[in-house]
């Protein structure tokens, strides 16, 4: 397994596939290589013309973590991956990973060649105080060492019925998700910082082309969030995919990535 070492000493495990211009896939909450069944499909389909990097975000899978957490440290992880592929790369981010990728694009304007965001889960109607309170609740669970409760809280927050959450906790698949439960605090921190009124000013540093994509079968707030992000980032464009939701078909989104980065 190839690895890179981030600036704070964290080891980031990744896979590299294909040849051509590099695209780094930035995962959303709960996603990592051991459980992700969608990202590998896109990686395979794009590897005939791009170098695709998939990696475990810090604290997940084969990547280590060093406390305390800061969004900048995850940006540093992405910078280390970009260096490993020659100093230039495009970024594709899914959900909260799209927001992290946006922060990296703003922080690394000379290194990121383009950014495709799929459904950044920013609710323009949510106040920064609410976002920070949600982060504080996750941080408290993390401090108490309760990754399972963190995962259950997250799943309930995205609409999974309580009975389904309870059933999932009894299933064989639960252990792989509970294993990364503590990292949900990272995603909530990313989203809280993005909800802050200072975020659009940071994003003005973006120089690369940006495409913000959503599916028309997703929750309405996903559309509103995608629209808001697109108007907050210089030169960003928008696209909506018919029939797609937050759990998209990789055979539909993959060609969009190919067209944008090609």
What does each model-identified segment do?
Residues 120, 124-175, 186-191:
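Helix-rich cap/lid subdomain of alpha/beta-hydrolase
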Residues 88-126:
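Conserved hydrolase catalytic core segment
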């Amino acid at each position: 397994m190839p690895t890179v070492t981030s600036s704070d000493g964290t080891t980031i495990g990744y896979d590299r596939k294909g040849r051509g211009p590099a695209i780094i896939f930035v995962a959303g909450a709960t996603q990592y290589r051991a459980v992700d069944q969608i990202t590998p499909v896109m990686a395979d389909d794009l590897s005939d013309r791009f170098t695709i990097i998939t990696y475990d975000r810090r604290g997940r899978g084969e990547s280590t973590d060093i406390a305390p957490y800061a969004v900048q440290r995850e940006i540093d992880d992405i910078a280390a991956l970009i260096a490993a592929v020659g100093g230039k790369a495009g970024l594709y981010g899914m959900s909260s990973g799209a927001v992290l990728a946006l922060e990296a694009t703003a922080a690394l304007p000379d290194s990121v060649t383009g950014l495709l965001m799929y459904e950044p889960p920013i609710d323009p109607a949510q106040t920064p105080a609410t976002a920070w309170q949600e982060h504080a609740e996750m941080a408290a669970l993390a401090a108490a060492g309760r990754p399972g409760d963190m995962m259950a809280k997250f799943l309930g927050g995205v609409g999974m019925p309580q009975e389904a959450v309870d059933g999932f906790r009894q299933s064989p698949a639960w252990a792989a998700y509970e294993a990364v439960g503590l990292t949900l605090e990272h995603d909530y921190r990313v989203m809280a910082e993005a909800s802050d009124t200072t975020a659009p000013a940071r994003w003005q540093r973006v120089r690369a082309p940006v495409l913000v994509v959503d599916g028309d079968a997703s929750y309405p707030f996903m559309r509103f969030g995608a629209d808001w992000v697109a108007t907050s980032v210089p030169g960003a464009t928008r696209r909506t995919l018919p029939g797609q939701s937050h759990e998209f078909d990789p055979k539909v989104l993959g060609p969009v990535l190919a067209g944008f980065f090609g």
